[in-house]
Structures are given as structure tokens and as C-alpha cells.
Amino acid sequence: MSIDIEKYPTLALVETPEDLRLLPKESLPKLCDELRLYLLNSVSRSSGHFASGLGAIELTVALHYVYKTPFDNLIWDVGHQAYPHKILTGRRDRIDTIRQKNGLHPFPWRDESEYDKLCVGHSSTSISAGLGMAVAAEQENLGRKTVCVIGDGAITAGMAFEAMNHAGDINPDMLVVLNDNEMSISENVGALNNHLAQLLSGKLYTTLREGGKKVFSGIPPIKELLKKTEEHIKGMVVPGTMFEELGFNYIGPVDGHDVIALVQTLTNMRDLKGPQLLHIMTKKGRGYAPAEQDPISWHAVPKFDPKTGTLPKSPNARPTFSKIFGDWLCEEAATDEKLMAITPAMREGSGMVRFSKEYPAQYFDVAIAEQHAVTFAAGLAIGGYKPIVAIYSTFLQRAYDQVIHDVAIQKLPVLFAIDRGGIVGADGQTHQGAFDLSFLRCIPNMIIMAPSDENECRQMLHTGYHYQEGPVAVRYPRGSGVGAPLQPLSELPIGKGIIRRQGKSIAILNFGTLLPEALDVAEKLDATVADMRFIKPLDKELILSLAKQHDILVTLEENAIMGGAGSGVNELLMQERCLVPVLNLGLPDLFVPQGGQEEIRADLGLDATGIEKSIKAYQAHSLR
């Protein structure tokens, strides 16, 4: 059921930013109110990222009002806050399809709209890409402007500072908007600071500023004195010294919910030369009390009733793999004070809330800094402690060199608890955990495990934690297990799988949580099923035995086929000169789009029906 746009009379006038720029400035607060309500009513029906968008309403309206999008470059970091941007850029009537199969993409996406200048999803990429676009715009010389919007979390990543350091060196015309949505508004925000921001960004101040620099440019001591004086005056009322040192002209902080003041400040800043940084303070979840009070829980939401102000509880009573991990952490830490758990800003998602409260001295949230997280763990291991890096599969990609250079080469005992392995679902291409088995399998000294259920996950985490001869990775999926009873912790034999079902002719070598589908298919085809458990080292003895006893081997994994566990089986068989037909089933050579997890598995032939169909087709071909 679509939303009746007639209930939003000002928003109804705005299909695109061109329409927005025709509105009188005085109508913008009304537009913001309607846009906020529209976002509430749409996301509550569709699910999606919520609190961030509520906090970015005024900024979104002001940016599209002042800048000539899509001619000007507007880049959103991560993209959680970009739902209002999508609503204002011709996608209002489809916003209720966001994150669904064949619906709007959850993040800004270049193939979806000319207003989306950069595909995003991972953090802290906006300033680097924006800097490249700004340099290209200068070469183009058509007056195109570039704006990057980045949050206070994303700007903590090293990549953002690398980009700002470079921008300060080459001095392009660009604007970085720091959307600071901490829980409380800064003391500096208010009438005085809003007025100061407009003054410091105004023509008179900037003319005097640049003119003075030109006059005294030949007298280095005086030029330096002017620079220090300016920084001192600004430093008395604004916290921008760090950004000034990087070469940015800092303006702010200002109230990010005063759309009229934002429009004035952005208008003043639009034609300033060199790198500019506008620091705005916003409230995550603004305008909806439950989200304001608990922005973490309301960051990404299922469908809910806006009138009740409560989020529905999951109907699945089985624990998630993330919770299994978090509970195991607490159980292990209870008897080992050398356990150190690390997360790059994913405490809630990784199931570490309980651990962080019960063992605060052994818990480290290093912010959005995956590279640092891994090398920090390496240092802890060298110091005699037992580090565990809890990280999503898709984010481990950002720390690949550190895994190799700082951990594996030195054979350091670091346990990688890799969450969201395989198909993640609604967040789409940027968040599927499709590649970890492939990019980890080729690293020497690395042990890799993939559990088939939640009990096996616990045992593998325990095994990896107590293995002290090198790094270990345990990868597990998003979502709940199958309800397997949890057994007391014990170490598994390294590199050994087990037979789950004995059959004939066909042997399915399963890696990970597709085991129920494998067993379902095996019942129909009377196939053998092996729960391989280890991707590296492979159970050579078991694989060769299955190859000798069966006509066809089928490898099954929720990872890219190229370079994955099945590729490892192929390599082993070739090395042993064992000639047997092998069917590799897994993720194809494409970036897996958004949709429900079960929808995607069905589309890719990784549900029981698809697996059976693929095996029968391969079997028929082999018999010709």
C-alpha cells in the first residue's frame, strides 16, 4: 500500500532537486517536517536504516537547495543517511521497496540514479573519491562543485584522514560536511556559533583573509603571524584546529537542524577556494522520540508500528550465531584473563554487548579501523595475550595486508571470528560475505573453519582460541542456527571432517551452514554427506576416500566458487592424480544483489531444490 502524497503538500511539489530549488526559502522548514514524517511512515512499512536518515533531513534539503545537483557532485559516506536524498531525487514513490529484491538499493548506487555519484556501503570512502572528483572538476573547468558528507564515526577511519591530508596538500575546491550526531548537542551550538559560522564563511571575511595573505605573502614571518592569529581567534570558539592543521578551512560547529541557517552557511561556502570543512551537530533519530532515546536500536529496523514506538521481537527463538559467539566469549573469559576481544565499531552486530559489560578491561572497540584492529591484535599476541578479532566478512577485506604482513607471516595466534560469512541479504553487493574463504585460503600458516551449526561454531571458536601455533579463522553466517543442542566445549582435531550420512554414488562435501540442504538432497538422491569443517587444512584422507568410493563429488559452500573451498578440493584431487568428476556449487562470479537470504539462495540454486537440480543435471551430463 503506497503512501498518500496528498498528506504531504509541500513534499508533493518536489519530485527532484530542481523542484526543490523553486521553493521559497521560508517553506523549507515545512518541507523538512513533511519529509521526516514521510520517512517515518515509509521505513516503518518497508524496514531499513532509519535513525541516521531522520538526523540528516535538514542537511539533505539544504545541500540540494544550494548546490546544483546532479551537475555538482554530492557524495554520501556509507549511505545509511541517504534515504531522504533518495526521496528528493525522483525515487519517492519507490522508497518502500528499499533493500528488497529488485527494489531501491539500500545505499547510493550509480546505476540507480544520476544523483548518486558514488556507490557506497563501506565507511570512510567519500573524501578520497570526492577529492578525485574535485581534481577532475578543476581539469574540466566548468564550475562543478564537490561536497562530501561524512559522519563522526566514519571520519575516525585512517582513510578519511589520508584523504584530508592529501587534499590539504594539493588544495582543491571541495567541501567536507562533518555530520556529527553524537548523543548530545555540543555546547558551542547555538545562536553565537551559527552567527560565527556565517561570518567566517561570508564574503567580507574571506576577502579580507585571502587579501591579507596576498599582501603579506612575501613576508614569511608576518604571513605566519596572521595564520596563527586567525587560528587563535577561531580556536577560542570552535574545535577545528586539527582540520586546520590538515589544510582545511574549518567552519562550525553549527546546528544541523536549522535548515535556514544551513542554507545561508552553505551558500556562503559554495564559492570558497580550497578545501573547506563544515562541522554540523545533529541528533540521530531526530523527530521520533523512541529513535532519539535509543538511536542504536533504531539504526536499522524491521517493519514496525510508529504509533507504539516499539520494535517487534524476532519470532525466531533460536540464538543467532552472533549471540553464540558473544556467549562463548564470556564463557572463555571466565577462566582466562588473557583473552582480549577486539571489534572495529561493531559491538552490537557482533554480539559483544554482554562481554563489553562483564569484561570491560578485556574489551576493545577500536572504532572504524579494521587495519588497526588486526595489527593491534598482532601486538597483543606478541605481548603474550590471546586476541580475538570479531569482524564482519565484508569488513575484513579492508585489513587484508595486515592479516598477511602483521599476523600470518609471524605465525601469531590471533583468532578471527568472522561474522556475516556468505549471503547477508538486504544490504546488497557491498555487504555480502562472498570472498573470505577465497582470500584467506591462499595465506600460509592460516587455519580456516566453517561450522555447520551453532554447537559446531562454539567448538570451532574454542579450538581456534586454544591453537597457539598461528592464526585461525572461524567464519559463520548472519542469522540463527538450526537449534542444535550446545555441548560442553572441547577441541576438535585439526583438519578433520566427519560423515553425516552414508550413501552411494554421489558424495556431497559440505563446507558451512548449508548442511541441512545437503542432507535434504542426500535423502532424495541417496548421497553421502560429509561435514568437512575445515577449509584449510582440508581433510585429505577423507576426500580421497570419498573420491574412491563415489562416482561424483559435489562441493557445497556459501562463498565464491572461484578460489573457495571447492577449488581447494579440485587442487587436492589434481595433485593426487585422482580423476573423479567434481561439481562445485557456491556463489557465482558476480556481486550478489540485495534480497532476503532465502530469496537469494533460491535464485542462485543454493536451496535444496536448486542443489538437487544442479546435481541431477551434472549427473546426466556425466553419464553421456
UniProtKB/Swiss-Prot annotation:
Pathway: Metabolic intermediate biosynthesis; 1-deoxy-D-xylulose 5-phosphate biosynthesis; 1-deoxy-D-xylulose 5-phosphate from D-glyceraldehyde 3-phosphate and pyruvate: step 1/1. Its cofactor is Mg(2+); thiamine diphosphate. InterPro entries: Dxylulose-5-P_synthase (IPR005477), THDP-binding (IPR029061), Transketo_C/PFOR_II (IPR009014), Transketolase-like_Pyr-bd (IPR005475), Transketolase_BS (IPR020826), Transketolase_C (IPR033248), Transketolase_CS (IPR049557). Mg(2+) binds at D152, N181. It is an enzyme of class 2 (transferase). GO terms for cellular component: cytosol. Binds 1 Mg(2+) ion per subunit. Its EC number is 2.2.1.7. The keyword Metal-binding applies. It catalyses: D-glyceraldehyde 3-phosphate + pyruvate + H(+) = 1-deoxy-D-xylulose 5-phosphate + CO2. HAMAP family: DXP_synth. Homodimer. Catalyzes the acyloin condensation reaction between C atoms 2 and 3 of pyruvate and glyceraldehyde 3-phosphate to yield 1-deoxy-D-xylulose-5-phosphate (DXP). Belongs to the transketolase family. DXPS subfamily. This is 1-deoxy-D-xylulose-5-phosphate synthase. It comes from Proteus mirabilis (strain HI4320). The lineage of its organism: Bacteria, Pseudomonadati, Pseudomonadota, Gammaproteobacteria, Enterobacterales.
